[in-house]
């Protein structure tokens, strides 16, 4: 079994063609939705983003417990459930809050994870030059 769980932060479903949005073309998302299981009757139970993520991870309403925080030791995340069923899970995220104090635990439930830097308040600034040009500029005139 292969499972890809796609979560977009602060994206209204009406922005995607697969859900009837027509303001912009979203052919890649539309193709993905056509080949996937989609949720048509899901509503956020807790807001904003991190409490909503805890809802999704645990299947419980976060606002009933607290406003903001990490997954707790007693929380059963969907990544835990997948692992128990023999399904490997991998997280790819640009969400820096997963790695800050108070947001810890969300990424650790997955079998593996990858953090794409440079979003939100992450101080890292990516290089945008093509790799070969960037390395030539950095090292071609250096003699060691």
Language-model region placement:
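Short helix-loop boundary/capping segments at the starts of domains
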Residues: 13, 38, 62-66
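Residue-level signal for pocket-adjacent positions within structured domains
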Residues: 11, 34, 38, 51-52, ...
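Short, surface-exposed acidic-centric catalytic microdomains
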Residues: 42-55
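Conserved S-adenosyl-L-methionine
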Residues: 37-44, 88-94
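Catalytic-site neighborhoods of secreted/periplasmic enzymes
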Residues: 53-144
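Short, electropositive, low-hydrophobicity segments enriched in small/polar residues
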Residues: 21-24, 49, 63, 98
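A short beta-strand-to-alpha-helix junction
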Residues: 22-25, 44, 69-76
């Amino acid at each position: 079994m292969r499972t890809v769980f796609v979560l977009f932060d602060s994206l209204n479903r009406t922005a995607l063609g697969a859900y009837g949005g027509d303001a912009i073309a979203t052919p890649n998302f539309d193709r993905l939705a056509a080949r996937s299981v989609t949720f048509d009757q899901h509503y956020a139970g807790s807001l904003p983003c991190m409490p909503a993520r805890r809802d999704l991870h645990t299947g419980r309403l976060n606002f009933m417990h607290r406003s903001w925080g990490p997954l707790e030791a007693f929380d059963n995340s969907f990544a835990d459930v997948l692992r128990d069923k023999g399904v490997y899970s991998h997280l790819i995220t640009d969400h820096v809050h997963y790695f800050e104090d108070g947001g810890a635990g969300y990424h650790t439930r997955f079998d593996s994870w990858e953090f794409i830097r440079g979003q939100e308040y992450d101080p890292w600034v990516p290089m945008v030059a093509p790799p070969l040009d960037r390395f030539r500029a950095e090292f071609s005139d250096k003699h060691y």
